Amino acid sequence: CDLCGHELLYKYPLVLLYCIENYIFVFQIVGFMEFIKEAGVSPQKSMDIKNDKITIKPLRDKDVGIFSKWLAKEYIYKWFCPDGEEHKMAWLDEVNNRNTQYHYMKHFIVYYNDKAIGFCLYLDCYFEKEYIPEHYGKTVDEKETVFEIGYLIGEEEYLGKGIGKIIVKKLIGEIAEIGGKEILADPDEANVLSIRTLLSNGFVK
């Protein structure tokens, strides 16, 4: 998984299940409009948070280079590429084939005042017939109902500023717009910042 210890399954609202290996967060979009309203996000305007300073835009071919550069940074590489260079190449293959083989994944570049500072994505779990059952212990029988998310902040000076929380809110808003009902995420237990970010966005422990 993009964010990949001891496993806990989190559901919204306030349901806790114990599992085996990884922290696995599940956000169920039940009463989602109420949650979004409280969080200050409009699903119809999910890009308009924080005075329009933080935006997400679809990844383009010319963005692959900066994404590759971010993946090579140690603090990102250890989470996104736990299997080393093979894993990095798999990421690059994914974004390069995002309109064909990986059409069910939506990749974005995150901008702060028009400066590219990060990356995020969501994927429709319906199309992952092996990974989702093996990793989350569930099957998905309908398109556009269950999604997985991931994100990174590629520029160090933007770490620790609450931008990850904004990114997750935007992804939740995007998924809600297309009728998603459940969102999955799988941060490593050592990735404390990502865990806090998910919890602060309604993935409740």
Which residues fall in each region the model found?
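A short beta-loop-alpha structural element at the N-terminal edge
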Residues: I54-K69
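Conserved GNAT-fold acetyl-CoA-binding loop/helix
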Residues: Y75-N96
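Conserved beta-strand in the GNAT
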Residues: I109, K115-D124, E148
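A short, internal acetyl-CoA/4′-phosphopantetheine-binding micro-motif in the GNAT/acyltransferase core
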Residues: G150-L159, D188
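Conserved active-site alpha-helix within GNAT-family acetyltransferase domains
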Residues: K165-I166, E189-K205
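Conserved GNAT acetyl-CoA-binding A-motif
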Residues: E177-P187
